Amino acid sequence: MAHFSCFPGALALSAFRQQRLLSTLKRIDPEIDAVSAQYLHFVAADAPLSADDAARVQALLTYGSPASAETEGDRFVVIPRFGTISPWASKATEIARHCALPQIHRIERGVEFTVTCKKGLLRGLTGGRKQLDEATRAAVAAHLHDRMTEIVVATREAGYGLFDVLPAKALRFVDLGSGDAAAGRGALEAANTEMGLALSDDEIDYLVDAYRKLGRNPTDVELMMFAQANSEHCRHKIFNADWTIDGETQDKSLFAMIRNTHQLAPQGTVVAYSDNAAVMEGGMAERWFPHAGTDGETGVPQYGRREALTHTLMKVETHNHPTAISPFPGASTGAGGEIRDEGATGRGAKPKAGLTGFTVSNLLLPEAVQSWENARDTAQPAAQRNPGDTAPGPVGKPDRIASPLQIMIEGPIGGAAFNNEFGRPNLGGYFRVYEQNVGGTVRGYHKPIMIAGGIGNIDAGHTHKHGLPAGTLLVQLGGPGMRIGMGGGAASSMATGTNTADLDFDSVQRGNPEMQRRAQEVINACWALGEDNPILSIHDVGAGGISNAFPELVDGADRGARFDLRQVHLEESGLSPAEIWCNESQERYTLAIAPGDFPRFQAMCERERAPFSVVGFATEEQQLQVVDGDAPADAVEHFPVNMPMDVLLGKPPRMHRDVRRVAQALPEVDVTGLDLETVARDVLRHPTVASKSFLITIGDRTVGGLNTRDQMVGPWQVPVADVAVTTLDYKGYAGEAMTMGERTPLAVIDAPASGRMAIGEAITNIAAAPIASLAQLKLSANWMAACGVDGEDARLYDTVKAVGMELCPALGISIPVGKDSLSMRTKWDDAGEAKEVVAPVSLIVSAFAPVTDVRKTLTPQLKPVASAGEAADTTLIVIDLGHGKHRLGGSILAQVTQQIGNSVPDVGDAEDLKRFFAAIQQLNAAGMLLAYHDRSDGGLWATVCEMAFAGHCGVSINVDMLTLDGAHASDYGDAKNWAQQVSGRRADMTLRALFAEELGAVIQVPAAQRDAVFAVLREHGLAACSHVIGAPNASGQIEIWRDAKKVFSAPRIELQRAWTDVSWRIASLRDNPECTQSEYDRLLDAEDPGISPNLTFDLAEDVAAPFIATGARPRMAILREQGVNSQVEMAYAMDKAGFDAYDVHMSDLLAGRTRLADFKGFVACGGFSYGDVLGAGEGWAKTILFNGMLAEQFAAFFNRADSIALGVCNGCQMMANLAPIIPGAGAWPKFTRNQSEQYEGRLVTVQVEASPSIFYAGMEGSRIPIVVAHGEGYADFSQQGDIGKVAVGLRYVDNRGEVTQTYPLNPNGSPQGIASVTTHDGRFTVLMPHPERVFRAVQMSWHPKDWAAAGDGSSPWMRMFRNARKQMG
């Protein structure tokens, strides 16, 4: 018999989030005047808790800020849905069991909200308060919970229903009738609508015929499985369709035209189209991982090297539909699914770094709605508009989807949170806002684009899956099944608004990244075995759940399979067979394992605490059988699925698209009378051009230690990088580059041009990285369109043809991977008026290439004049691949002036791009380029401004050479008789030159090398379109000159604040507004010197060298708990310093496989132990403190005279909670939520204090940049420690070297800038920043140039690890 209890916990909302929620609730009922929230913990135990056990549980569940006294009001208890076990509960229960509480059956968490109304005069006299009526309660409740995973109950006692086991729902059959085909078809049509299957008429006929031949009725399981496996999302029916356009049969499908690129340029591609990700050729790399069989005396594997041919994975996915419905989980699971695709390639691989992109409709920011954010018809010529006309208001949106602003507040956090917790850096991406009324059709992205992509690495020997002998075990690895994401594949294939609201919401998955981390650790352990890898084949579980993944796994090997439904790992009771088999619960993989290898695989899973289950086995007969072990063997319910594989995955009817092209007459962009001052600022404020900082600092960009170029550039950390770059390993400088290109608004005017420009932009972006040749470039193409809307199908076909049959073949590059999402329109009814928003054909290109030397990557940071008043010593040159056409159609200028245009930028000649790429590579190799930035959204104006922002300087631009008559343009960069060559109106030509978004780039070169640069450009045929346009200035002004007159001048600070405005506003709606204001105001500091390192020691000195020379290598335990993700780079740094590094999981200590006594020291690594359940690092610490064996072992270790330990980030949080058993740590604080209430990923500066720490010996007084990546780094002395007595090792300092609490220089608000503390004897030190991620200079997004050349290229932080080795003697 279970025994239930409820333990109240900490505050669930910070003060500013409480105030924000109150503002929302006041819009429901203005009389609501207070809201509070407190965590509740519901505990189910197998036996009554003793007083000691209850006290232990209370201590376990004490974390965060104490709750205030209860207040009166309406109570709302939000808890997980009955019958489910939440991810939080799984981790908390596991922690409890590790804390010597075996009788705990389960711990669940809820939140009790108390909503209080005003007393009012009469109620004030009687002492009473207004109670909410039922309608208001329902409206309030809707804002307090996620109805997919949570419910609202009225009392705490009702929460005990969480532990009820619900009865399983029955299998259903669809009766097709005995002989009446029409009746059978009608029954299937009804099921199609009821279940949201999205089956076409042809598919319904196919299924009726197939089941008549099988002589039985289909089950709901089979229908749901078929619908997911054959959805547009999974089978890409439109891309494989036959086409007729304007009555003319087309000879190729869309997919055939994409494949054409690979057929013509297969070189360098290892895997294309046949797996979860594409694979391009890499190179020899030093792979670094724990080696099985090296356990020796320690019982755990030692880290080591293996030189191996290592290839690069490429994958880019979209998750548009879920993000429209529920932005945080939609984007989170989009990122998670793409990561799984990489890990499930071949026979197992390792994800490495990510990209993220968003496209939405107008944001309509509160108190900052822009003049162009309305429904004015842009097809009306500007000259015909009456200035007094009032523009129609915004088009609105359906209730069932999130607003664009909500998507951009919640979606990026969802995607970043998954990447952060899983442990993959996100290094690049894009953000576009587009919405315009064009001739009565609203074009935009109410159904957003949410794109997640990335790269990974795979051993050359693991790139292809193996065959599956009959009897091969079919295993589910990872998270449990729950009723989540039902019908997601089918739902995402429908236009938003054509499904029911409940089915739309059902189709959104929810994420648990810590679980996926555990599963990935198992995959890593498998591929690390090389030829002994037990994985024969692997697939990720995505659309359709295991009902799609398991059949794909066996179909690829020409096998059938038999599964037992009751062996599927679940954490929800009451599921029907269809819900068990078809749900899209995340963090799952399906694997094929040979029976003989299973014991070893099982041991790996148990060590990582990764759930797994053997669900079935492969069969020779190609029949798919799913049996229900709970049903009698002779009952019809015993076989929820029993069908030939070729019925499920064979050849359902091939789609035929019969479409037509639709011509449209649009006016050209009219710039007559436009005010340059206004337009310049409006363009910078447009979200597409504006700073993306709010999307970037929320993400971890350094985990793994292999990144060298992220979005942030220079000592002022401005987000303007063109390309993301990683290294292949921790030793060399070869690596990979990736970037994105997209120009979707152009498709409204000329869809094929938009496709060509997307590829062109990807090339001009990636050109910033040193790449041997353009032929090494590989592209991913993600295609979006509103198929079915008149003219859009033909536009899609023409765009794919332009890319796949023309441009890519001409460039000699291929597209080995991609995805499509072809239901990009939103329909709804607004008070009887039918409305819709139709997205343009949208090609998002991601480009990938091997990099020869990551140190040569170019950035947009301008190098300023040598000193104030001196003549400019550098020159800016624009390379204009538009050859002076200055086409404005679809540009940001057109959008902010509410125009569309009829002529767009285009790639006129593929040879231009090839010559451009070759010229930039040659100039870079010769060391002639100081800065580089491609021209894109916002045109030359935005390009130059961003370069100045990154350089923290002014710039003077002369547009004379850009306003010439194109027929008389010089082939050299100097003006010659320009006054005689000018034609047309000068002001108009200036606007076109500044704001046209033609392909090209601006380069900064030493003035002394200008002639040599032009010689190279002339060699590549580019001199005629290359022009000297100016230079940095010392005035801090951004100036535009024409005809020897200054036509525009504004302070860089003013323009940079305009450019940052959108980011600041969105961050202020999401994070602590005091912090976001502080960051915004930092732009006012004109004299800010930027990051300013100062070293008090010799960077080239290796203090560990004499001790390494003895040959002694002390053992260092690289300690991790489930969810930790920074152990690999830490192990490398320790190994480089002269230690033997061993991989020690807490499960190893619990199982007795090893003991801390076997090691000289340990490092507790960063990440998200237990997903930060029970507080960051606290769950990890409590499994030690409340477990007698572990507490004794750790206490003994700390009390040894020769031991040392380091805690970093999550390890710092954990060790701070161990302070009671660490000698000399009594004054240590806890580390709690950042003052910004946000995860902070930044490069900041710390000062090394004089302290006893052995890790900082000889570094005192140094100011050194270091990365932070945490959400809970605030040194909190309110519950523990003594700020007056604590020994501080590091403090955050500002760019002038002063200790600071100013955000974001102090990223968490810690008092007195505390970033690290140590014990009185200095042997045990903890710090929140990550030195292990920047032990090489090249790992920093910015560092002084001389650091990379010093010694072995180590950064100053390598001294920490070498100090530890020196301490060991």
UniProtKB/Swiss-Prot annotation:
Provide the GO MF annotations for this entry.
ATP binding; metal ion binding; phosphoribosylformylglycinamidine synthase activity
Q: Which GO annotations describe the biological process of this protein?
A: 'de novo' IMP biosynthetic process
- Domain named Glutamine amidotransferase type-1 is located at 1116-1369
Q: What is its main location?
A: cytoplasm
Q: In which pathway does it act?
A: Purine metabolism; IMP biosynthesis via de novo pathway; 5-amino-1-(5-phospho-D-ribosyl)imidazole from N(2)-formyl-N(1)-(5-phospho-D-ribosyl)glycinamide: step 1/2
A single Gene Ontology CC annotation of this entry is: cytoplasm
- Report the subcellular localization: Cytoplasm
Active site location: C1209, H1330, E1332
Q: Which reaction does it catalyse?
A: N(2)-formyl-N(1)-(5-phospho-beta-D-ribosyl)glycinamide + L-glutamine + ATP + H2O = 2-formamido-N(1)-(5-O-phospho-beta-D-ribosyl)acetamidine + L-glutamate + ADP + phosphate + H(+)
Q: Which residues bind ATP?
A: G330, A331, S332, T333, G334, A335, G336, G337, E338, I339, R340, D341, A721, S936
Q: Where does Mg(2+) bind?
A: D722, E761, N765, D934
Residue ranges, annotated region (Disordered): 321-352, 373-400
Q: Which UniProt keywords apply?
A: ATP-binding, Cytoplasm, Glutamine amidotransferase, Ligase, Magnesium, Metal-binding, Nucleotide-binding, Purine biosynthesis
EC number(s) for this protein?
6.3.5.3
Q: Transmembrane stretches, by residue range?
A: none
PANTHER family assigned to the protein according to its UniProt record, in alphabetical order: PHOSPHORIBOSYLFORMYLGLYCINAMIDINE SYNTHASE
Function text: Phosphoribosylformylglycinamidine synthase involved in the purines biosynthetic pathway. Catalyzes the ATP-dependent conversion of formylglycinamide ribonucleotide (FGAR) and glutamine to yield formylglycinamidine ribonucleotide (FGAM) and glutamate.
- Supply the HAMAP family for this chain: PurL_1
Q: Which family does it belong to?
A: In the N-terminal section; belongs to the FGAMS family.
Describe the protein's quaternary organization and the partners it interacts with.
Monomer.
Q: What is this protein called?
A: Phosphoribosylformylglycinamidine synthase
Q: Which organism is it from?
A: Ralstonia nicotianae (strain ATCC BAA-1114 / GMI1000) (Ralstonia solanacearum)
- Give the lineage: Bacteria, Pseudomonadati, Pseudomonadota, Betaproteobacteria, Burkholderiales
